[in-house]
Amino acid sequence: EFDNSSKNMLETRFGLVPESFKLLKNGELPLVVTDYVANGSFASLKANVTLYQEPNYAYFIRNTDLKSGTFEVFVDEHSYNFLSKSTLYGGEIIISNVGDVGSVFLCPKLDKPMTLGNNIIMLRPEQENLRYYLYIWFKWLYGQSLIQGIKGGSAQPKFNKTDFKNLPIFLPPDDLLEQFHQIVKPMFELIDENNMENQALTRTRDTILPRLMSDELDVSDVEI
């Protein structure tokens, strides 16, 4: 049983923390940290990546898309394959690191392949029970303050992957981390299900509405 009595707590910059927690750096976690530019030089990216405003092979996931919940930029199959170091499968933690620094999202699962856009970094835990703990940590007050503490640049705030990997993080013991994961996992899965249902409804609306407007679809006999 977890004991959080004061005699088992340590005073830290984050306040009182159980002495059983480990203080690590992000770079010491079993975690893949990558971004768009990990795939090559700016010249090679320009030569091999083409963005489209109409549907194509894969989604190009940007910070603005994650904020709005609408995904309207795409890449072709060649671009997607070239960007293999930043492929998204859903469930990754995405953090904006240029401009709007510190926005944190869980990558949704969409109906096409996905690849990471620019100005954001992606975290893919190799240990499943780290996923939601890390997401909440970076959304939380202290996680946010740590991220804001490493941003530089006057005209356009930003931070780099190296500084991010050097940030401290408190990690609970494995048994407590697993308990936490099992408690919050159903909540996040329900959110995912609702998001997928919303996407399906949006696709249905976008298919039917033009047919209604053009009188191609007759609903005059439908009883409400």
Describe these PLM feature segments.
Residues 62-63, 82-143, 150-155, 160-161:
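A short beta-sheet element
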Residues 34-39, 131-132, 145:
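Acidic/polar loop patches that form or flank catalytic/metal-binding clefts of enzymes
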Residues 78-81, 110, 123, 186-192:
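Short, contiguous acidic/charged loop-to-helix segments that flank catalytic cores in large enzymes
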Residues 27-50, 59, 63-90:
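Sequence-specific dsDNA recognition surfaces
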Residues 121, 132, 148, 165-171, ...:
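Glycine-rich beta->alpha junctions and the first turn(s) of the following alpha-helix
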Residues 1-44, 166, 170, 174-215, ...:
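Non-catalytic DNA-recognition/assembly elements of restriction-modification systems
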